[in-house]
Amino acid sequence: MKQTLATLFAKDAAPTRALTWPFFLWIAGLVLLFFPHDFDFPAIVYAAKTVLCAILMVALKPWRYVPNAPAKGAIGLGIWVGIAIYVLWALPEALPYPAVKEWYQRWLVMMPGTLPDYSASWCYAYSRHPVLAVIKLIGSAFVIAPIEECFFRGFLMRWLTQKTWQTLPFGEVSRYAFWVTVAVFAFEHDRYVGGALAGMAYGALAVRTGSLRASIVAHVVTNFLLGLHVLLLDAYGFW
Protein backbone atom coordinates (compact mmCIF):
# COMPACT_ATOMS: atom_id res chain seq x y z
CA MET A 1 0.00 0.00 0.00
CA LYS A 2 2.80 2.43 0.96
CA GLN A 3 4.57 1.67 -2.31
CA THR A 4 1.36 2.26 -4.27
CA LEU A 5 0.73 5.60 -2.57
CA ALA A 6 4.35 6.62 -3.07
CA THR A 7 4.09 6.05 -6.81
CA LEU A 8 1.27 8.59 -7.00
CA PHE A 9 3.69 11.28 -5.88
CA ALA A 10 6.67 10.20 -7.96
CA LYS A 11 7.90 12.55 -10.67
CA ASP A 12 7.11 10.03 -13.40
CA ALA A 13 3.56 9.48 -12.10
CA ALA A 14 2.08 12.59 -13.70
CA PRO A 15 -0.19 10.56 -16.01
CA THR A 16 -1.55 8.53 -13.09
CA ARG A 17 -2.18 11.65 -11.02
CA ALA A 18 -3.87 13.44 -13.91
CA LEU A 19 -6.26 10.57 -14.60
CA THR A 20 -7.06 9.68 -10.97
CA TRP A 21 -6.79 12.65 -8.62
CA PRO A 22 -9.86 14.56 -9.90
CA PHE A 23 -11.93 11.40 -9.35
CA PHE A 24 -10.49 10.85 -5.88
CA LEU A 25 -11.30 14.46 -4.95
CA TRP A 26 -14.84 13.96 -6.21
CA ILE A 27 -15.32 10.83 -4.13
CA ALA A 28 -13.73 12.48 -1.08
CA GLY A 29 -16.53 15.04 -1.13
CA LEU A 30 -18.98 12.25 -0.34
CA VAL A 31 -17.46 11.94 3.13
CA LEU A 32 -19.05 15.25 4.06
CA LEU A 33 -22.50 13.75 3.53
CA PHE A 34 -22.01 11.33 6.41
CA PHE A 35 -22.25 14.24 8.85
CA PRO A 36 -25.67 15.59 9.94
CA HIS A 37 -26.99 18.04 7.36
CA ASP A 38 -30.15 19.58 5.96
CA PHE A 39 -31.63 18.93 2.53
CA ASP A 40 -29.73 21.80 0.88
CA PHE A 41 -26.27 20.72 2.03
CA PRO A 42 -25.61 17.96 -0.59
CA ALA A 43 -26.48 20.38 -3.40
CA ILE A 44 -24.00 22.90 -2.00
CA VAL A 45 -21.34 20.20 -1.66
CA TYR A 46 -21.97 19.14 -5.27
CA ALA A 47 -21.49 22.71 -6.47
CA ALA A 48 -18.24 23.02 -4.51
CA LYS A 49 -16.97 19.69 -5.86
CA THR A 50 -17.82 20.76 -9.40
CA VAL A 51 -15.73 23.92 -9.13
CA LEU A 52 -12.78 22.32 -7.30
CA CYS A 53 -12.65 19.24 -9.54
CA ALA A 54 -12.88 21.36 -12.69
CA ILE A 55 -9.93 23.45 -11.48
CA LEU A 56 -7.90 20.34 -10.64
CA MET A 57 -8.72 18.71 -13.98
CA VAL A 58 -7.61 21.80 -15.90
CA ALA A 59 -4.44 22.01 -13.81
CA LEU A 60 -3.48 18.35 -14.33
CA LYS A 61 -4.56 18.19 -18.00
CA PRO A 62 -5.42 14.46 -18.18
CA TRP A 63 -6.14 14.70 -21.91
CA ARG A 64 -2.38 14.83 -22.50
CA TYR A 65 -2.09 11.17 -21.47
CA VAL A 66 -4.79 9.51 -23.56
CA PRO A 67 -5.24 9.21 -27.34
CA ASN A 68 -7.29 12.09 -28.69
CA ALA A 69 -7.65 11.07 -32.31
CA PRO A 70 -10.67 8.76 -32.49
CA ALA A 71 -11.43 6.56 -35.45
CA LYS A 72 -13.59 7.96 -38.21
CA GLY A 73 -17.20 8.25 -37.11
CA ALA A 74 -16.34 7.66 -33.44
CA ILE A 75 -17.73 10.97 -32.21
CA GLY A 76 -21.04 10.42 -33.98
CA LEU A 77 -21.19 6.91 -32.58
CA GLY A 78 -20.49 8.34 -29.13
CA ILE A 79 -23.42 10.73 -29.47
CA TRP A 80 -25.81 7.94 -30.40
CA VAL A 81 -24.56 5.70 -27.61
CA GLY A 82 -25.01 8.56 -25.16
CA ILE A 83 -28.61 9.03 -26.29
CA ALA A 84 -29.30 5.29 -26.03
CA ILE A 85 -27.94 5.09 -22.48
CA TYR A 86 -30.05 8.08 -21.44
CA VAL A 87 -33.17 6.33 -22.77
CA LEU A 88 -32.31 3.07 -21.01
CA TRP A 89 -31.58 4.96 -17.79
CA ALA A 90 -34.76 7.03 -17.72
CA LEU A 91 -37.32 4.84 -19.51
CA PRO A 92 -38.14 2.30 -16.75
CA GLU A 93 -39.23 5.11 -14.43
CA ALA A 94 -40.98 7.11 -17.15
CA LEU A 95 -43.32 4.36 -18.39
CA PRO A 96 -47.01 4.81 -17.49
CA TYR A 97 -47.04 1.49 -15.65
CA PRO A 98 -46.85 1.97 -11.86
CA ALA A 99 -46.22 -1.72 -11.20
CA VAL A 100 -43.20 -1.76 -13.54
CA LYS A 101 -41.82 1.41 -12.00
CA GLU A 102 -42.27 0.08 -8.46
CA TRP A 103 -40.59 -3.25 -9.28
CA TYR A 104 -37.70 -1.47 -10.97
CA GLN A 105 -37.14 0.93 -8.08
CA ARG A 106 -37.49 -1.81 -5.47
CA TRP A 107 -35.03 -4.26 -7.01
CA LEU A 108 -32.83 -2.42 -9.50
CA VAL A 109 -32.10 0.73 -7.50
CA MET A 110 -29.97 0.79 -4.35
CA MET A 111 -30.73 -0.70 -1.90
CA PRO A 112 -32.42 -3.78 -3.41
CA GLY A 113 -35.58 -4.80 -1.60
CA THR A 114 -36.51 -1.29 -0.49
CA LEU A 115 -38.31 1.54 -2.24
CA PRO A 116 -36.38 4.83 -2.43
CA ASP A 117 -38.33 7.71 -0.87
CA TYR A 118 -37.83 10.41 -3.47
CA SER A 119 -40.63 12.52 -1.98
CA ALA A 120 -38.34 13.31 0.96
CA SER A 121 -35.13 13.38 -1.05
CA TRP A 122 -32.57 16.13 -0.69
CA CYS A 123 -32.61 16.21 -4.48
CA TYR A 124 -35.57 18.57 -4.34
CA ALA A 125 -33.23 21.27 -3.05
CA TYR A 126 -32.55 21.91 -6.72
CA SER A 127 -36.17 22.91 -7.30
CA ARG A 128 -35.71 25.67 -4.71
CA HIS A 129 -32.29 26.86 -5.88
CA PRO A 130 -32.11 27.36 -9.67
CA VAL A 131 -28.44 28.38 -9.56
CA LEU A 132 -27.49 25.13 -7.84
CA ALA A 133 -29.59 23.24 -10.39
CA VAL A 134 -27.68 24.83 -13.29
CA ILE A 135 -24.36 24.03 -11.60
CA LYS A 136 -25.53 20.45 -11.11
CA LEU A 137 -26.42 20.16 -14.80
CA ILE A 138 -23.07 21.59 -15.90
CA GLY A 139 -21.12 19.60 -13.33
CA SER A 140 -22.75 16.25 -14.08
CA ALA A 141 -22.29 16.62 -17.84
CA PHE A 142 -19.06 18.55 -18.33
CA VAL A 143 -17.06 17.86 -15.16
CA ILE A 144 -17.87 14.50 -13.58
CA ALA A 145 -18.49 12.71 -16.91
CA PRO A 146 -14.97 13.46 -18.26
CA ILE A 147 -13.47 12.79 -14.81
CA GLU A 148 -15.13 9.36 -14.61
CA GLU A 149 -14.06 8.45 -18.13
CA CYS A 150 -10.47 9.47 -17.42
CA PHE A 151 -10.45 7.32 -14.29
CA PHE A 152 -12.43 4.26 -15.39
CA ARG A 153 -11.61 3.94 -19.08
CA GLY A 154 -8.45 6.06 -19.22
CA PHE A 155 -6.73 4.56 -16.16
CA LEU A 156 -8.44 1.71 -14.27
CA MET A 157 -9.31 -0.50 -17.24
CA ARG A 158 -5.74 -0.21 -18.54
CA TRP A 159 -4.06 -0.55 -15.13
CA LEU A 160 -5.99 -3.75 -14.39
CA THR A 161 -4.78 -5.12 -17.71
CA GLN A 162 -1.14 -4.21 -17.19
CA LYS A 163 0.49 -2.39 -14.28
CA THR A 164 2.82 -0.63 -16.73
CA TRP A 165 -0.35 0.66 -18.36
CA GLN A 166 1.25 3.66 -20.04
CA THR A 167 3.04 1.37 -22.50
CA LEU A 168 -0.19 -0.47 -23.33
CA PRO A 169 -1.77 0.54 -26.66
CA PHE A 170 -5.08 2.22 -25.87
CA GLY A 171 -7.97 -0.16 -26.43
CA GLU A 172 -5.98 -3.33 -25.76
CA VAL A 173 -7.52 -4.46 -22.47
CA SER A 174 -8.14 -7.85 -20.91
CA ARG A 175 -11.63 -9.25 -20.38
CA TYR A 176 -10.95 -9.28 -16.65
CA ALA A 177 -10.09 -5.56 -16.68
CA PHE A 178 -13.10 -4.71 -18.80
CA TRP A 179 -15.65 -6.49 -16.59
CA VAL A 180 -14.14 -5.45 -13.27
CA THR A 181 -14.25 -1.84 -14.46
CA VAL A 182 -17.88 -2.29 -15.49
CA ALA A 183 -18.73 -3.72 -12.06
CA VAL A 184 -17.00 -0.93 -10.12
CA PHE A 185 -18.63 1.71 -12.33
CA ALA A 186 -22.04 0.07 -11.90
CA PHE A 187 -21.96 0.07 -8.11
CA GLU A 188 -20.77 3.65 -8.03
CA HIS A 189 -24.34 4.50 -9.07
CA ASP A 190 -27.60 3.94 -7.21
CA ARG A 191 -29.18 2.62 -10.42
CA TYR A 192 -26.60 -0.11 -10.70
CA VAL A 193 -28.16 -1.92 -13.67
CA GLY A 194 -28.18 1.30 -15.66
CA GLY A 195 -24.63 1.88 -14.46
CA ALA A 196 -23.58 -1.54 -15.71
CA LEU A 197 -25.13 -0.93 -19.14
CA ALA A 198 -23.46 2.47 -19.32
CA GLY A 199 -20.13 1.02 -18.22
CA MET A 200 -20.30 -1.66 -20.91
CA ALA A 201 -21.22 0.86 -23.60
CA TYR A 202 -18.61 3.45 -22.68
CA GLY A 203 -15.93 0.78 -22.27
CA ALA A 204 -16.76 -0.80 -25.61
CA LEU A 205 -16.56 2.61 -27.27
CA ALA A 206 -13.10 3.25 -25.84
CA VAL A 207 -11.88 -0.18 -26.93
CA ARG A 208 -13.44 -0.12 -30.38
CA THR A 209 -12.34 3.40 -31.31
CA GLY A 210 -8.97 3.29 -29.59
CA SER A 211 -9.65 6.68 -28.07
CA LEU A 212 -11.15 8.05 -24.89
CA ARG A 213 -12.84 10.93 -26.67
CA ALA A 214 -15.77 8.87 -27.95
CA SER A 215 -16.61 7.51 -24.49
CA ILE A 216 -16.33 10.99 -23.00
CA VAL A 217 -18.73 12.33 -25.62
CA ALA A 218 -21.19 9.51 -24.91
CA HIS A 219 -21.02 10.08 -21.15
CA VAL A 220 -21.44 13.85 -21.54
CA VAL A 221 -24.48 13.38 -23.80
CA THR A 222 -26.09 10.90 -21.38
CA ASN A 223 -25.61 13.11 -18.32
CA PHE A 224 -26.69 16.28 -20.11
CA LEU A 225 -29.89 14.71 -21.44
CA LEU A 226 -30.63 13.17 -18.04
CA GLY A 227 -30.12 16.57 -16.42
CA LEU A 228 -32.58 18.17 -18.85
CA HIS A 229 -34.98 15.31 -18.11
CA VAL A 230 -34.73 16.07 -14.39
CA LEU A 231 -35.30 19.80 -14.78
CA LEU A 232 -38.05 19.64 -17.39
CA LEU A 233 -40.03 16.82 -15.76
CA ASP A 234 -39.24 17.54 -12.09
CA ALA A 235 -37.71 14.07 -11.89
CA TYR A 236 -35.29 15.02 -9.12
CA GLY A 237 -34.98 11.44 -7.91
CA PHE A 238 -32.40 10.90 -10.66
CA TRP A 239 -30.16 13.46 -8.96
Can you annotate each of these PLM segments?
Residues A10, A14, H37-D40, Y126-P130, ...:
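Juxtamembrane loop-transmembrane helix junctions in multi-pass integral membrane proteins
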Residues V66-I144, T161-E172, Y236:
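Juxtamembrane helix-loop-helix connectors linking adjacent transmembrane helices
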Residues A125-W239:
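Transmembrane helix-loop-helix hairpins at the membrane interface
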Residues D38, K61-Y65, A94, P98, ...:
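Transmembrane helix-loop junctions in multipass membrane proteins, especially transporters and channels
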Residues P15-G82, Y86:
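Alpha-helical transmembrane segments in multi-pass membrane proteins
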Residues W26-F34, I83-L91, V182-H189, N223-H229:
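Aromatic-anchored segments of alpha-helical transmembrane domains
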Residues T4-P22, E172-V173:
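N-terminal membrane topogenic signal
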